[in-house]
Amino acid sequence: MRIRTLLVLLGAAIAATASAETKISGELQCKSEPPTPVAIPDKPNHAFVVVKATCTWTKPFEMGGSQVKDGTETISSEISGDRASDHGYFAGAMAGGDTYTVKFGGTSHSKDGKSAGNEGTWSFSGGTGKLKGLKGGGKYKSAPAAADGTITTQVDGEYSLP
């Protein structure tokens, strides 16, 4: 009876360790291509915008034994005045060649036509190779855009692998 109880407890401990989430934190810099706005004529400064950006991790983290490297994000925003509701995807690459996809959404602000920062939540929506079955998510927060249009984003969260 004691051996069976010990085996059950050991199995539960191994299962809990295997599914435990690992904290991650990093910093990403993105530079966007010119946006594609479509005005909505119901009120001033109302539009839908699609933006594509190339991004590099300036403070990378590791997942599955490899370091995050770079990626591309595609953002769809509904702008109303100086605020926007953002939704998008980030397709990222690892130094070892595996890839991952992130879905995100949040709110951004602008001032004088330039990004004044944004924040929101994100979650992994896929992965390849060692990242197959990747799960997790977290929050992000961006600083106002630099003079050259580069946006720096702090990303924090957690992940787990099967």
What feature does the model see in each segment?
Residues 10-11, 43:
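Extended interaction regions within the primary functional domain
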Residues 1-7:
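Bacterial N-terminal signal peptides that target proteins for export
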Residues 20-162:
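Beta-strand-enriched cores of mature, soluble protein domains
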Residues 11-19:
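Hydrophobic h-region of N-terminal signal peptides that target proteins for export
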